[in-house]
C-alpha cells in the first residue's frame, strides 16, 4: 500500500515529445507566433549564410572540380544571338553580278541548285552579254542549276525535310564538313559554336553560300555544352517557336523544330594521362559524354505528345582509340562509354523508343584537333597499308549513315 502512494512514473520520452509539440521549433507556440507576425506584416529574420560557409563551398568546388570550373560551365547560349542563313537567292544575285563585272569565274563556285526561274533567267542574261567564253559557260551552268527542281534530284534532296543539330562546329572540322553535306542535301541545320568568333560566323555565311540547295537553312547559335543549363536551353529553343511582337504585329522568328538528326561533335582539347585523372578528366567527360546523353534525351523528347512515330537519328562519333595512343585525357573512356549508350538503349525504352543510332568507329582523320599533330606520319602509315581520311571524306561516310535508307 505504501508503494502505491508514490504516484505514477512519468515516461521521459513522452514528456520530451509533448514539450516539442508545445515549445519546439515547429510547436504550437512557434506556429502561433509566426501566424501573428504574418498577420502584422512582420517577417521573421532569416539567418544569412555565413562567410565561413561560403568559403567552405568555394574550397570544396576548387578541390573537387578545379578553380576554373564555374567558368567552364558558364552558359553562353543566347537566342537573341542566333543567326539564320536562308537568303541564298539574294547572295546568288550578288555572285552573278560580281562574276560579270569583275570577269571572275570563281564567283560562280557556290551552289545555285533549285534557286528558281528568276536566278536562272538572270544567269542566262549574263551569259548572253559576256564576251568571256569560260564565263559564258559558267553562267549557262548556273542557269541550268537554278532551273532544276531540287526535290527531283536524289543528291540535292536526300536530307530535305530533315532538321539536323550539329554541335561543336569550327572551320575545317569534321562537324563543318557534315554541315556542308547536310546543306547540299536540303536540310535545315542548327549548328552550335562555343567560341562564336567572327571567323566562325564568316565560315557559316560562306558555307551556306557554297553548299545550300533547295530550301536548305542554316542556324548558327552560341552554346557551351559543358553547361547543362545550355544543353537544356538549346533543346528548349530548338523545340519551341520563337516570336517577336511589336504592337499588334507578331512575327515568327523561328518555327518549333522537331529534330531528326543529331551529330554531337562538341569536344575540348583532350590531353593528360591517367595520373591527371580528376578535375581534368571530369571536365572533358562532361562535354563529350554526359552533356551528349542529356542532349539525346532532351532532343528525343521534342514532339513526343504530338508525333508519336517520330525518331531522332543520332550519329555517335565513335573511335577505335580506347587509350591506345595515351596522353589524350578522357577520350578513350568516353568513346568506350558510347558503346554503353547504344547498349542501354535496348533496355531503357523510356527514352530510346524515339531514338535510333549509328555508331561508326571513326579512324585516322587528317588535320583535326585530335590527330592533326600526327599529320607528318600520314605518308609513312599509308605506305604500310593504313588508310587515313580527310575531314571531308569521313563526313561523306557519316552522312551515308544518316539517310532514311540507312
Where are these regions (language model features)?
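C-terminal helical subdomain
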Residues: 1-9, 14-24, 28-49, 53-106, ...
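Flexible cofactor-recognition loop at the NAD(P)H-binding site
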Residues: 42, 171-172, 195, 261-272, ...
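Canonical Rossmann dinucleotide-binding motif of NAD(H)/NADP(H)-dependent dehydrogenases/reductases
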Residues: 150-192, 196
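Catalytic loop of short-chain dehydrogenase/reductase
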Residues: 155, 266-381
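Rossmann-fold scaffold of SDR-type NAD(P)-dependent oxidoreductases
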Residues: 167, 222, 246-269, 316
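Glycine-rich phosphate-binding loop and adjoining beta1-alpha1-beta2 segment
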Residues: 195-213
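Rossmann-fold cofactor-recognition segment
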Residues: 208-229, 233-236
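Short, hydrophobic alpha-helical segments
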Residues: 239-242, 303, 398-405
Amino acid at each position: 500500500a505504501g508503494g502505491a502512494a508514490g504516484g505514477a512514473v512519468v515516461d521521459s520520452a513522452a514528456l520530451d515529445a509533448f514539450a516539442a509539440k508545445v515549445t519546439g521549433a515547429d510547436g504550437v507556440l512557434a506556429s502561433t507566433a509566426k501566424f501573428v507576425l504574418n498577420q502584422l506584416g512582420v517577417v521573421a529574420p532569416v539567418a544569412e549564410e555565413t562567410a565561413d560557409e561560403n568559403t567552405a563551398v568555394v574550397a570544396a568546388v576548387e578541390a573537387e572540380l578545379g578553380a576554373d570550373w564555374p567558368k567552364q560551365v558558364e552558359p553562353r547560349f543566347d537566342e537573341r544571338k542566333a543567326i539564320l542563313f536562308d537568303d541564298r537567292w539574294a547572295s546568288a544575285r550578288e555572285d552573278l553580278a560580281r562574276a560579270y563585272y569583275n570577269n571572275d569565274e570563281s564567283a560562280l563556285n557556290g551552289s545555285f541548285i533549285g534557286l528558281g526561274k528568276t536566278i536562272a533567267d538572270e544567269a542566262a542574261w549574263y551569259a548572253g552579254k559576256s564576251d568571256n567564253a569560260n564565263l559564258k559557260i559558267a553562267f549557262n551552268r548556273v542557269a541550268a542549276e537554278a532551273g532544276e527542281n531540287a526535290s527531283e534530284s536524289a543528291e540535292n534532296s536526300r536530307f530535305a525535310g530533315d532538321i539536323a543539330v550539329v554541335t561543336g562546329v569550327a572551320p575545317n572540322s569534321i562537324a563543318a564538313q557534315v554541315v556542308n553535306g547536310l546543306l547540299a542535301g536540303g536540310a535545315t541545320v542548327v549548328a552550335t559554336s562555343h567560341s562564336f568568333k567572327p571567323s566562325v560566323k564568316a565560315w557559316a555565311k560562306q558555307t551556306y553560300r557554297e553548299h545550300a540547295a533547295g530550301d536548305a537553312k542554316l542556324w548558327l547559335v552560341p552554346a557551351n555544352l559543358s553547361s547543362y543549363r545550355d544543353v537544356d536551353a538549346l533543346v528548349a529553343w530548338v523545340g519551341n517557336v520563337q516570336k517577336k511582337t511589336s504592337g499588334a504585329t507578331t512575327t515568327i522568328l523561328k518555327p518549333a523544330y522537331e529534330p531528326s538528326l543529331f551529330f554531337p561533335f562538341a569536344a575540348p582539347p583532350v590531353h593528360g594521362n591517367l595520373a591527371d585523372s580528376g578535375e581534368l578528366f571530369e571536365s572533358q567527360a562532361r562535354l563529350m559524354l554526359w552533356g551528349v546523353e542529356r542532349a539525346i534525351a532532351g532532343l528525343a523528347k521534342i514532339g513526343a505528345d504530338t508525333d508519336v512515330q517520330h525518331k531522332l537519328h543520332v550519329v555517335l562519333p565513335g573511335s577505335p582509340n580506347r587509350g591506345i595512343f595515351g596522353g589524350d585525357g578522357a577520350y578513350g573512356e568516353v568513346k568506350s562509354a558510347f558503346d554503353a549508350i547504344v547498349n542501354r538503349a535496348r533496355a531503357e525504352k523510356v527514352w530510346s523508343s524515339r531514338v535510333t543510332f549509328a555508331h561508326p568507329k571513326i579512324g585516322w582523320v587528317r588535320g583535326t584537333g585530335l590527330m592533326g599533330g600526327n599529320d607528318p606520319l600520314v605518308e609513312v602509315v599509308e605506305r604500310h597499308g593504313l588508310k587515313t581520311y580527310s575531314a571531308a571524306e569521313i563526313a561523306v561516310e557519316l552522312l551515308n549513315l544518316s539517310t532514311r535508307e540507312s
